[in-house]
Amino acid sequence: MKLIVGIGGMTNGGKTTLTNSLLRALPNCCVIHQDDFFKPQDQIAVGEDGFKQWDVLESLDMEAMLDTVQAWLSSPQKFARAHGVSVQPEASDTHILLLEGFLLYSYKPLVDLYSRRYFLTVPYEECKWRRSTRNYTVPDPPGLFDGHVWPMYQKYRQEMEANGVEVVYLDGMKSREELFREVLEDIQNSLLNRSQESAPSPARPARTQGPGRGCGHRTARPAASQQDSM
């Protein structure tokens, strides 16, 4: 059984924290981070807003990310070993892949591969404050959040909803533990439902046939006597 779970949503919504907690709790679980597929800085264009376009889909090598997902699909065991994940014997038939990122549901070739799609949100002010407390390899220039980050988040979320992509929205203002328990329980229920669906139906007991009644055959009527025909 293979399960691909998306942990998506806005920047600084709590995606990485939730993903790391799930990674430790779920059996035979691997993770792919979308941030690992950013193109080199010299390939990031400057947009009409005057900022480097880090928060658009074109800033990511999504074909390479898709290839990595396909590698997991073709052999979860091999992928797990290559990434230092030990396959648990008691759950050797179950393999889970977590995809974590801010634009998981905007790349069509990936959208239909998810078994579950989660989307973390926090209010504007909270998101802006969290962003200001983070240290990035490439520091945010003044005005980036309001001039680029937030408008791009709104744009891609609106496109996702307009395209009818079904997601489970998560309140990023909840405690880490509460979010973790909520998602873990949902994933475990999905695994249980899938295992029940794939389990063979119990054999129905054979019906006991009465004397002279073979399966699918009617008992022949005795030939009518001459008296009966009169």
From Swiss-Prot:
Provide the residue positions that the database annotates as binding substrate: D35, D36, F37, F38, W54, D55, R131, Y136, T137
**Which enzyme type, at the first EC level?**
transferase
Q: Where are the transmembrane segments?
A: none
Q: Does the keyword Nucleus apply?
A: no
GO BP, one example?
NAD metabolic process
EC number in record: 2.7.1.22, 2.7.1.173
Oligomeric form and interacting partners: Monomer. Interacts with ITGB1 alone or when associated with alpha-7, but not with alpha-5.
Q: What is this protein called?
A: Nicotinamide riboside kinase 2
Name the gene.
NMRK2
